[in-house]
């Protein structure tokens, strides 16, 4: 083979397949891979929006940590206050429920807080309130009153504890009672005769009952707070339902003297019958006198009490009317001044 042919790679007729050529092996050079650090050589330019977001994120993280610390401090203070409150409630319950032998409440470790100690000492040193003087009370009654005052103080201690005073709220609610009376369905007056004097001040129809409801106020005394609502029953229109709210602050009016009148009429009729009637013979003169004398006396007392109560209510109504009149004071001052001038001595 000619040398110029062997030098041409395209015209090489070398038949050594799979065997490395010496010239080719000598000419191969190892490749060196060079890793270039592009991040350090050429730093990336940050977007101003990204920088602003990173700053905002850092600020929010710092604020979140600060809020977490504040929340932990508040939770610790709340737990401390809750424990103190529970201790105070327990101590007040023990003092009010009969724990008077222990002068001051102690904590779990056995130590007494200074504020509670001072409070208990002041309560122990303070004398009980003196009993109200009573001119007709016996001397031995005076020794019982301090105990009653101590019991009242214990009740006040129980009421001022953490438990709600339900009894006070129940006493503030007006007393409600109902009365059922049979009445004629054709009677539309809605009047229930219960012995008191009432003044009607309103009437309306409710949703649950087609019959109207009437509203009354007690007019027997000016300051009586009792109200009455009268309405027919929705199930039976022959029944009137009277609902009373409150309690009367006066006595019940005396009933009419029908029994005394009936007894007097009966005695007159029995005296006027003929003597030959066997069943209606008149009794002895002394027996009717003994029977009717208490009734007459009782009727006189009731009439006197009724007239006294009517005069008292009339005086109260007149006083209220005069005090509400704005011109009453001016007229009273004028009358008094004129009377004083008339009675004053005049100098000659």
From Swiss-Prot:
Tissue occurrence: Highly expressed in aleurone cells. In seeds, predominantly present in the plumule, radicle and scutellum of the embryo. Expressed in roots, stems, young leaves and spikelets.
Short sequence motif Nuclear localization signal: positions: 116-122
Description of what induces expression: Induced by biotic elicitors (e.g. fungal chitin oligosaccharide and fungal cerebroside elicitors) and pathogen infection (e.g. the compatible pathogenic fungus M.grisea race 007, M. grisea crabgrass BR29). Accumulates in response to M.oryzae. Triggered by defense signaling molecules, such as salicylic acid (SA), methyl jasmonate (MeJA), 1-aminocyclo-propane-1-carboxylic acid (ACC), wounding and pathogen infection (e.g. X.oryzae). Repressed by gibberellic acid (GA) (at protein level). Induced by abscisic acid (ABA) in aleurone cells, roots and leaves.
Residue ranges flagged as DNA-binding region: 187-253
InterPro entries in alphabetical order: WRKY_dom, WRKY_dom_sf, WRKY_plant
One annotated GO biological process: response to molecule of fungal origin
Biased composition (Low complexity): 102-114
Any one GO molecular function term: DNA-binding transcription factor activity
Region: Disordered, residue numbers: 91-141, 246-287
One Gene Ontology term, aspect cellular component: nucleus
A matching Pfam family: WRKY
Keywords linked to the UniProt accession: Coiled coil, DNA-binding, Gibberellin signaling pathway, Nucleus, Plant defense, Repressor, Transcription, Transcription regulation
Region Transcription repression of gibberellic acid (GA)-induced promoters: start-end pairs: 267-348
PROSITE patterns assigned to the protein according to its UniProt record, in alphabetical order: WRKY
Subcellular location: Nucleus
Disruption phenotype: Impaired repression activity on gibberellic acid (GA)-induced promoters.
Biased amino acid composition, Pro residues: 126-136, 275-286
Coiled coil: 50-84
Subunit text: Interacts with WRKY51; this interaction promotes W box binding of the complex WRKY51/WRKY71 in a zinc ion-dependent manner.
Entry text on domains: The WRKY domain (213-266) is required to bind DNA.
Family note: Belongs to the WRKY group II-a family.
Function description: Transcription repressor. Interacts specifically with the W box (5'-(T)TGAC[CT]-3'), a frequently occurring elicitor-responsive cis-acting element. Represses specifically gibberellic acid (GA)-induced promoters in aleurone cells, probably by interfering with GAM1. Regulates, probably indirectly, the activation of defense-related genes such as GF14E during defense response. Modulates plant innate immunity against X.oryzae pv. oryzae (Xoo). Confers resistance to the virulent bacterial pathogen Xoo 13751, probably via the regulation of NPR1 and PR1b defense signaling pathways.
Protein name (Swiss-Prot/TrEMBL): WRKY transcription factor WRKY71
Gene source species: Oryza sativa subsp. japonica (Rice)
Gene: WRKY71
